[in-house]
């Protein structure tokens, strides 16, 4: 097994985390706050002020022997509106912006190729960040695995998308 990680900001992290937990080859997920202005751990309340620059983000650890970052990035694009700025579903604010953040620069070319595919298909410039990971702080415990603990909890993603994600093969 070869474990690698990638970070996806896809709006509210509750739904994005639950979505990626359905995907083949994903070993672990963790919700948190990424690429903000500070190097100290923010609270959810602080992130919601739009003053910290952090995005609600999901750290995805995957088995590179089972799947790859191109497949995961394509899956990500199925779960977001890539043209929307600072908004996904009913959630609005800079913390809900979309982005793909990488700690391993060797992943960038594969991710960039998927961005180009999507941009060519849509014929428009994407509103999705593609940046190196500057920082990531795990969110509070009550946010981790939120939809597993609260199956009737709020989610901006449709339930059918989770079923669809389980059916996809790398």
Q: What kind of feature is each model-predicted range?
A:
Residues 1-170:
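Flexible coil/turn and secondary-structure edge motifs
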